[in-house]
């Protein structure tokens, strides 16, 4: 997959939990300034990490169950998930280089 995938609460298990590669899950909202800043960064990273990490986004305004399950209180919150388990969390936007380093450290 070379582009960011938008998911919802109903898709979570099939897309994230059952994934055979790590997932970078971005919890975001359309009104969130830092979320808007990180969106193009995620779009750039998706093809660079194709086959190694799947980048997915979930709108917290439209989906409350999954963010609540993970205790998301601030956005953007990025979770790196491997084999259905959270292995790293990043709250807040990062520049592309730092976000790529965050991913590489945990995959």
UniProtKB/Swiss-Prot annotation:
InterPro entries membership: Thioredoxin, Thioredoxin-like_sf, Thioredoxin_CS, Thioredoxin_domain
Keyword terms of this UniProt record: Disulfide bond, Electron transport, Redox-active center, Transport
Domain of life, per lineage: Bacteria
One cellular-component annotation, GO: cytosol
Span of domain Thioredoxin: 2-107
Annotated GO biological process: cell redox homeostasis
MF terms (GO), sorted A to Z: protein-disulfide reductase activity
Paired cysteines (S-S): 32-35
Function: Participates in various redox reactions through the reversible oxidation of its active center dithiol to a disulfide and catalyzes dithiol-disulfide exchange reactions.
Family designation: Belongs to the thioredoxin family.
Name used for this protein in its record: Thioredoxin
Annotated source species: Haemophilus influenzae (strain ATCC 51907 / DSM 11121 / KW20 / Rd)
Gene that this polypeptide is encoded by: trxA
């Amino acid at each position: 997959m070379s582009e960011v995938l938008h998911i919802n609460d109903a898709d979570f298990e099939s897309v994230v939990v059952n994934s055979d590669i790590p997932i970078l899950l971005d919890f975001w909202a359309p009104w969130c300034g830092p979320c808007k800043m990180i969106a193009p960064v995620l779009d750039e990273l998706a093809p660079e990490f194709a086959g190694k990490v799947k980048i997915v986004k979930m709108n917290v305004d439209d989906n409350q169950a999954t963010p609540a399950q993970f205790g998301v209180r601030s956005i953007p919150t990025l979770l790196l998930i491997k084999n259905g388990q959270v292995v790293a969390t990043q709250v807040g936007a990062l520049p592309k280089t730092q976000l790529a380093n965050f991913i590489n450290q945990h995959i």
